[in-house]
Amino acid sequence: MQRVTITLDDDLLETLDNLSQRRGYNNRSEAIRDILRGALAQEATQEHGTQGFAVLSYVYEHEKRDLASRIVSTQHHHHDLSVATLHVHINHDDCLEIAVLKGDMGDVQHFADDVIAQRGVRHGHLQCLPKED
């Protein structure tokens, strides 16, 4: 492990210290390592051709005009990406769906964009992880 020195302005250091405390890090180095790993992983998933895993989560109104069938159609069109799906009934009108995906990150992003762009889908979020060799 290498020791490096960085310079941060006071406001940024205070923000880092607050984040470290909220997340329970023992020291700044642990927090900075995790932040850096996250940024590097996100960057790696932006490269077309990169293989990886992702979690797509979203809320949708199950009775919205044909929305459920459009989402299922999109899922079947990208069936090669889907590893597993969890479906939760939040209330009478809304469902939470969580899909674990695996494959080319460009294809995963395209699938996520197709789902999230559907009218009636809310709170869409894609978390990508590059495949580690």
Curated annotation (Swiss-Prot):
What processes does the entry annotate via GO biological process terms?
Answer: response to nickel cation
Q: Which UniProt keywords apply?
A: DNA-binding, Metal-binding, Nickel, Repressor, Transcription, Transcription regulation
Q: Which InterPro entries match?
A: Acetolactate_synth/TF_NikR_C, ACT-like_dom_sf, Arc_rbn_hlx_hlx, CopG, CopG/NikR_regulator, Ni_resp_reg_NikR, Nickel_NikR_proteobac, Ribbon_hlx_hlx
How many and how are cofactors bound here? Answer: Binds 1 nickel ion per subunit.
Q: Does the keyword Membrane apply?
A: no
Residues recorded as binding Ni(2+), renumbered to this chain, are 76, 87, 89, 95
Annotated GO molecular function terms are: DNA-binding transcription factor activity; nickel cation binding; sequence-specific DNA binding
What does this protein need as cofactor? Answer: Ni(2+)
A Pfam family of the record is RHH_1
Sequence similarity: Belongs to the transcriptional regulatory CopG/NikR family.
User: What does the annotation say about its assembly with partners?
Assistant: Homotetramer.
Which HAMAP family does the record associate with it?
A: NikR
What exactly does this protein do?
A: Transcriptional repressor of the nikABCDE operon. Is active in the presence of excessive concentrations of intracellular nickel.
Q: What PANTHER family does UniProt report for this protein, alphabetically? A: NICKEL-RESPONSIVE REGULATOR (PTHR34719:SF2)
Name-wise, this protein is: Nickel-responsive regulator
Organismal lineage: Bacteria, Pseudomonadati, Pseudomonadota, Gammaproteobacteria, Enterobacterales
